[in-house]
Amino acid sequence: MANDKKLVESITSMDEDFAQWYTDVVKKAELVDYSGVRGCTIFRPAGYAIWENIQKELDARFKATGVENVYMPMFIPESLLNKEKDHVEGFAPEVAWVTHGGGEQLQERLCVRPTSETLFCDFYSHIIESYRDLPKLYNQWCSVVRWEKTTRPFLRTLEFLWQEGHTAHATAEEAEERTIQMLNLYADFCEEVLAIPMVRGRKTDKEKFAGAEATYTIEALMHDGKALQSGTSHNFGDGFAKAFNIQYTDKENKLQYVHQTSWGMTTRLIGALIMVHGDNSGLVLPPRIAPTQVVIVPIMQKKEGVLEKAAELREKLGAFRVKVDDSDKSPGWKFSEHEMRGIPVRVEIGPKDIEANQAVLVRRDTREKTVVSLDEIDTKIGEILEAMQKEMLERARNHRDAHTYEAHSTEEFADVVANKPGFVKAMWCGERACEDEIKEKTGATSRCMPFAQEHIADTCVCCGKQAKSLVYWGKAY
């Protein structure tokens, strides 16, 4: 990436080659760089600042529900990982192992954490004794390693940043309540802050997390019609508790197993932001997540008083995340650069504007230009940012709804998947064989059984037997 030509060169059209468009945007918006290890990326300031804002927003929401942050080691002894059979089998192909340390072979291999259930379970088994110790509501921000065969920045990398919450409860009801609570927290965050509408639902048994009783998911639809799993919340029941002997003494002085949950979100969300809102000029960031909400571009900045006025304007706009671009680049270059980086509002101000006590505001998403009095500029920018946030969500929801189809037969299902990228709603009998057959024949996977169930047919779209659930299907990242 360092050897790329000019940042503001034209990027591949998303309609021509969506995958290349995505790569171009990631490169030219300077979000990440490639490292010397295949599948590992370096977060550049522009990319990491988005993740910092995601962290800040989510962390506050977690803590409002009573969650506390902790940090677990990155290494897991092999014997500990092997304690929960389904869990280890689910992750075995992706695990990275440390076999040597300090120049010597280790007596026991250490796994570089792909996820931390086993560490939290081992910890809980030592600190939970009584019902008075419950619930335990812990979260950690860290990186994990999964040895993926194919990788793409943000969407699938060997090492990625995430948060993983792990809770322990006295009853099954409390655990289920927490599982759903966190899923809804995720969905609300995505819709309110990232302006990405979500389908909330339950994964099929085939798609659920290894070792979980139930996995709930939020699914988003990208601009190219592919789905992106954007956050998951798992109810483990007492399965892990039995494997790790996590017991507590209840009020009747009887030993009981705890019921557990885990839930996580990752830097995939940045990929979702790019693919839901981006256009052929680069990123388009919703104001609430944008590291810089307003950029001031002085015109003819070497003229007397222009930079001083820009600095004065920055102070006036202190309620927003604002920067002045006083670099030596031309105004046209700066416009393209800030469009590429998705900054929501650009303020243009030059000698004639100063004389007229005005500035020009440009919205990133619609390119709409507004001439506004400097006396009212802070109010007007606030209105633009609020409108932009709301309208970006509406556009994304309209796009998703326009690309959500129904199928009532195998032939119709295959035709929709082949010719109409998007979500496909179809009834399902509940049998894994049908799920496997649909994937084999069409490449579509079950995304979720939505909480908002509909009855669009009596029979399974695959086998024709009595249907049990409506499922959202689709090709996915």
Curated annotation (Swiss-Prot):
Localization of this protein: Cytoplasm
InterPro entries: aa-tRNA-synt_IIb, aa-tRNA-synth_II, aa-tRNA-synth_II/BPL/LPL, Anticodon-bd, Anticodon-bd_dom_sf, Pro-tRNA-ligase_IIa, Pro-tRNA-ligase_IIa_arc-type, Pro-tRNA_ligase_II_C
SMART domains named among the record's database cross-references: ProRS-C_1
Disulfide bonds, paired cysteine numbers: none
SUPFAM superfamilies the UniProt entry points to: C-terminal domain of ProRS, Class II aaRS ABD-related, Class II aaRS and biotin synthetases
UniProt keywords, alphabetically: Aminoacyl-tRNA synthetase, ATP-binding, Cytoplasm, Ligase, Nucleotide-binding, Protein biosynthesis
The protein's Enzyme Commission number: 6.1.1.15
Protein family (similarity comment): Belongs to the class-II aminoacyl-tRNA synthetase family. ProS type 3 subfamily.
Domain notes: Consists of three domains: the N-terminal catalytic domain, the anticodon-binding domain and the C-terminal extension.
Subunit annotation: Homodimer.
Biological role stated in the UniProt entry: Catalyzes the attachment of proline to tRNA(Pro) in a two-step reaction: proline is first activated by ATP to form Pro-AMP and then transferred to the acceptor end of tRNA(Pro).
Protein name per Swiss-Prot or TrEMBL: Proline--tRNA ligase
Lineage, highest ranks first: Bacteria, Bacillati, Bacillota, Clostridia, Lachnospirales
